[in-house]
Amino acid sequence: MNFLLMASFAEVMNYVLYVLIAVLVLLVMITVHELGHYLTGKIFDFAIEEFAIGFGPKIFKKTKKNGEVFSVRVFPLGGFCSFRGEDKEDGDPRAFNNKKPWQRIIVLVSGALMNYLFAIFIICLMFGIYGTSALMTYEVSGENPSGIILTDENSFKNRDVILKANGKDVYIITDLMNAVNGKKLGDTVDFTVIRNGEKRDMSIVMLADADLKNVEDVNGLCNVLGIKVEKDEEDNVVSNGFRSTGVRRGFFTTIGCSFNYSFKLAGTIFTVIGQLFHGEIGIKSLGGTFTTISVTAGVIKTGGWWSLLNIASFIGVNLAVFNLLPIP
C-alpha cells in the first residue's frame, strides 16, 4: 500500500512539474510579446509607465530614474506594457496619443511580430538539434476492411518517415490531410518516405474515401492510410499511430524549413479559425489559457524536449496570429 501511495504521489508531482514548465513556457511567450511593445516604444521615444510580468498584486517592483516601473506580479499568466496617454488624453508629447499614427501602429503590431520571430528562433533551434520536422508512422493498424491487396510498395509500414506527399513537404499532420483529402477508395497518392534508412518514392493506396471534414478528423486520416487509432469508451480518439520526428538536413535547408514550418503553423491556425466561422468545429476547439497549459503539460510529458520546443513554437505563432486579428 505504501509503495502504491508513493508511486501515485510521484506521478502527481511529475505532472505538477510538467504543468509548471507549461506555465513557464506561456509566461515566456507573453513576456516576449510585451517586450516587442516595449522595445519599439523605446525606439520611438514613447513614455512608458510600466512593464509587468504576470498580473495581480506586485511581488517585486523597481522604478527607474526616468519613471518607468518594472514589476513582477503574483499570477504568472499574463503581463503588460503600459504607455502614458494610452487610455486618456495627455499633454506630454511622448504620450501614446500624441505620437504619429504609423509609430503607434508599429508599436501595436510589434508584440505579435516579436512572438513570430521568437517562434522561428525556437524552430531553428529545434530543427538544428533534432532535425527538421517530419511525420513517422509509428504504428500501422494491421487491419484492412477494404479488401485491397496491400504490399510493401503501396502501404505504410511501422516507422516509415514521411518526407513528402504529392511532391509537397510534410511537416505536420494537416499536410497529410491536404494531400489525401478528396481521394476515393483505391486511389493512390505519391509519397516520399524513409524506410529502414533508405529514401524511396511510393504510391500509397487509399483504404477508404478521404472525406476529411476538418483539422480534427485525425481518425478519418488514419482510416484512409491504415494507421492505428486508439479510442475511449465514447469513441473519441485518444491517440494515433503518427509521431513527430526529425530529419537531418544542411544548414541553409534547415533555416528555410524553419520559416516554412512557421508558415505551416500559421496556416493551420487560420484554417481552424475558418472552420470555426463555418461551424465545422466548435468554439471549444480553441480552448483558453488553462486548456493551453493542460495540453502543453501533456505534450511535454509524452514527448520530451522536442515536443516542448515544438509546442512553444506553436504557442508563439498562435499568439502572433490572434493578436493581429481584429478581435477585442
Language model segments and positions:
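Internal alpha-helical transmembrane segments
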Residues: 32, 43, 50, 70, ...
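PDZ-domain C-terminal substructure recognizer with occasional recognition of PDZ-binding tails
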Residues: 163-164, 178-234
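Functional transmembrane alpha-helices
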Residues: 2-13, 99, 141-148, 209-321
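Conserved PDZ fold ligand-binding element
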Residues: 145-174
